[in-house]
């Protein structure tokens, strides 16, 4: 196994926790990246990783991304993530998630989590019986419902801001958008785009789902092969499925003017952002435009107010514009511009939180 501390240094992490429970078969890793802004927040995914090293690399990379996403979304949480090493189709059990509830609860409010790839809200109903460190539960258990709605809305606002930057108007009527992946988020995004008069090309590994959407929206939708959707001529390419779609193999194949989508970690490496810029393709950082779901979950932990969630999600529009203009003015990539904003915000918070609120020894004396 690789040197864990070396990896933590590379990504800038505070804490990594390995969780094991032989009776349920649980093997999991929790990573807390940065808690300057508040408790760590991030989803819990379940994947049959090939090795512990692969799982560790994933949880470190994803939790760092959550720090940036929380900062840009202006929520008082830091970045965290949990990964379970296992097959979600056969390794789940109520007992396994109750054990997760104990491990996460044992962090005493330093980490909050919920659904991600391979997990669903119903899984965490069991975990929530053991601690209050879970968000995104079903409505019947006190949660606030499907996060795909605000996620899609945030991507939509990101597209509007991109259109304004590129074409001087945020109207998407008549624009061609190629959507890669029409799952929960992709389908809701498709609906929003069709409603404002955009034309959409769609692709998904679920061909039946695509056919159903074609039947629903008619000539507003064109079906495309899932292996060539990124090569389609369009105004905006929107990756809403797997990450890593911008890589050495695809970088010269894009025929779009902008990339704005909900998929996480769309760039395989930072240098791919510079390569997109060289090709005059405008890239909206994924960890900003897909932050709508995070905004809802964070607000749920603070009491939840629907109008506040909508307002913060709509603010993605202004932040995307700010990043585009900053990147242009400073001759840097959009990701570099976003990262600078995050670092500036965290520095300000660090300066503010140097002030001691209470001597912990006072509590001990009570």
Swiss-Prot record:
SUPFAM superfamilies: Aminoacid dehydrogenase-like, N-terminal domain, NAD(P)-binding Rossmann-fold domains. GO terms for molecular function: phenylalanine dehydrogenase activity. NAD(+) binds at residues 45, 116, 151, 181-187, 204-205, 241-242, 262-264. It is an enzyme of class 1 (oxidoreductase). One of its GO terms (biological process) is L-phenylalanine biosynthetic process. Pathway: Amino-acid biosynthesis; L-phenylalanine biosynthesis; L-phenylalanine from phenylpyruvate (PDH route): step 1/1. The keyword NAD applies. It catalyses: L-phenylalanine + NAD(+) + H2O = 3-phenylpyruvate + NH4(+) + NADH + H(+). Keywords: NAD, Oxidoreductase. InterPro entries: Aminoacid_DH-like_N_sf (IPR046346), Glu/Leu/Phe/Val/Trp_DH (IPR006095), Glu/Leu/Phe/Val/Trp_DH_C (IPR006096), Glu/Leu/Phe/Val/Trp_DH_dimer (IPR006097), Glu/Leu/Phe/Val_DH_AS (IPR033524), Glu/Phe/Leu/Val/Trp_DH_bac/arc (IPR016211), NAD(P)-bd_dom_sf (IPR036291). Transmembrane segments: none annotated. The active site is at 81. Its EC number is 1.4.1.20. PROSITE patterns: GLFV_DEHYDROGENASE. It comes from the Bacteria. Thermostable. Belongs to the Glu/Leu/Phe/Val dehydrogenases family. Catalyzes the reversible NAD(+)-dependent oxidative deamination of L-phenylalanine to phenylpyruvate. This is Phenylalanine dehydrogenase. It comes from Thermoactinomyces intermedius. The lineage of its organism: Bacteria, Bacillati, Bacillota, Bacilli, Bacillales.
């Amino acid at each position: 196994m690789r040197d864990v501390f070396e990896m933590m240094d590379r990504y800038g992490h505070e804490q990594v926790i390995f969780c094991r429970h032989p009776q349920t078969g649980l093997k999991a890793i929790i990573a807390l990246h940065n808690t300057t802004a508040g408790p760590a927040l991030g989803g819990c995914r379940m994947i049959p990783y090939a090795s512990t090293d692969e799982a560790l690399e994933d949880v470190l990379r994803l939790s760092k991304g959550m720090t940036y996403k929380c900062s840009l979304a202006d929520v008082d949480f830091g970045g965290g993530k949990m990964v379970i090493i296992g097959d979600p189709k056969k390794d789940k059990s109520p007992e396994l998630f109750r054990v997760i509830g104990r491990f996460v609860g044992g962090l005493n409010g330093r980490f909050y989590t919920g659904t991600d790839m391979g997990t669903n809200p119903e899984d965490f109903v069991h975990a929530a019986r053991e601690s209050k460190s879970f968000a995104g539960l079903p409505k019947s258990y006190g949660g606030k419902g499907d996060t795909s709605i605000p996620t899609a809305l945030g991507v939509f606002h990101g597209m509007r801001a991109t259109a304004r930057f590129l074409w001087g108007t945020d109207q998407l009527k008549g624009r061609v958008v190629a959507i890669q992946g029409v799952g929960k988020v992709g389908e809701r995004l498709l609906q929003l785009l069709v409603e404002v008069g955009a034309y959409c090309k769609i692709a998904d590994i679920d061909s039946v789902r695509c056919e159903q959407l074609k039947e629903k929206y008619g000539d507003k939708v064109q079906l495309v092969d899932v292996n060539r959707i990124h090569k389609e001529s369009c105004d905006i390419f929107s990756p809403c499925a797997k990450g890593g779609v911008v890589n050495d193999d695809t970088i010269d194949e894009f025929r779009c003017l902008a990339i704005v989508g909900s998929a996480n970690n769309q760039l395989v490496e930072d240098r791919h952002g510079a390569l997109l810029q060289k090709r005059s393709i405008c890239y909206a950082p994924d960890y900003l435009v897909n932050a709508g779901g995070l905004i809802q979950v964070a607000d749920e932990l603070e009491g939840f107010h629907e109008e506040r969630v909508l307002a913060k999600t709509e603010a993605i529009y202004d932040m995307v514009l700010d990043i585009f203009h900053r990147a242009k003015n400073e001759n840097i990539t959009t990701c570099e511009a976003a990262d600078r904003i995050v670092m500036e915000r965290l520095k300000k918070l660090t300066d503010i939180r140097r002030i001691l609120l209470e001597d912990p020894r006072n509590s001990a004396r009570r």
